[in-house]
């Protein structure tokens, strides 16, 4: 390998045989040894700006390149002339790509809570789907229409007259049932009367006639034996 002015050279035979580092052939034509990999399309100036100043090129590097646009064209007027000693215009400072959201999650949660607080009882049922379709719900029923429960101090004695005592009406209208207390003697006499009425049997003849009939039957049985 021959170094001339900081550039490495080798013969074509050694370059093709991957022996450029051991090449000492100076008697033939030499070729410049290229770096491994793809050739760089960016000049050293653009590389330095990207590495040190965090600049981002807007496009491919056109500095000292054969792809430079024609003189006088629109692209030539807007191109960077940093290679001519002017300030570099082909690079811009990188900007953060963060986008501001329309609204924070906390604000949306507060709006939803305020909307729910403004609804009535029926509106909440419809919103939660408890009562089915909204057409079947009476929207006039709201919380303020309900009466508050009575406190202990507000109950009056005359309010007992307004109670529904329909279950006591049959007892008051039936005259056969007496509300007076019954004594023990009356209860016992009623019990004995009931028992005699159930145990007695009506017989069409008296006890004497039964005795006479029994004597006749017994004598008849004795004769037959």
Curated annotation (Swiss-Prot):
Which parts of this chain are annotated as the region Binds copper and DNA?
1-108
Q: What is its main location?
A: nucleus
Q: Write out the ranges of the annotated region (Required for transcriptional activation).
A: 109-225
- Pfam families reported in the protein's UniProt record: Copper-fist (PF00649)
Q: Which domain of life is it from?
A: Eukaryota
Report further notes: Present with 1760 molecules/cell in log phase SD medium.
Q: Could you tell me what this protein is called? A: Transcriptional activator protein CUP2
State the organism named in the record. Saccharomyces cerevisiae (strain ATCC 204508 / S288c) (Baker's yeast)
């Amino acid at each position: 390998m021959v170094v001339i002015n900081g550039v490495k050279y080798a013969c074509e035979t050694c370059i093709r045989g991957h022996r450029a580092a051991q090449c000492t052939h100076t008697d033939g034509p030499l070729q410049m040894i290229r770096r491994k990999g793809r050739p760089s399309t960016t000049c050293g100036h653009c590389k330095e700006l990207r590495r040190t100043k965090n600049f981002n090129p807007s496009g491919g590097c056109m500095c000292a390149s054969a792809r430079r646009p024609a003189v006088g064209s629109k692209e030539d007027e807007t191109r960077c002339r940093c290679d001519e000693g002017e300030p570099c215009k082909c690079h811009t400072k990188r900007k953060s790509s963060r986008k501001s959201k329309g609204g924070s999650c906390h604000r949306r949660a507060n709006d939803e809570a305020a909307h729910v607080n403004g609804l009535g009882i029926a509106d909440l049922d419809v919103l939660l789907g408890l009562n089915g379709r909204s057409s079947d719900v009476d929207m006039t029923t709201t919380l303020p229409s309900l009466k508050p429960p009575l406190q202990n101090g507000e109950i009056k004695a005359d309010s007992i007259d307004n109670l529904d005592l329909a279950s006591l009406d049959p007892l008051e209208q039936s005259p056969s049932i007496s509300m007076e207390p019954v004594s023990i003697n009356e209860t016992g006499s009623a019990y004995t009367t009931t028992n005699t009425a159930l145990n007695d049997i009506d017989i069409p003849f008296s006890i004497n006639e039964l005795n006479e009939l029994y004597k006749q039957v017994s004598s008849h049985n004795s004769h037959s034996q």
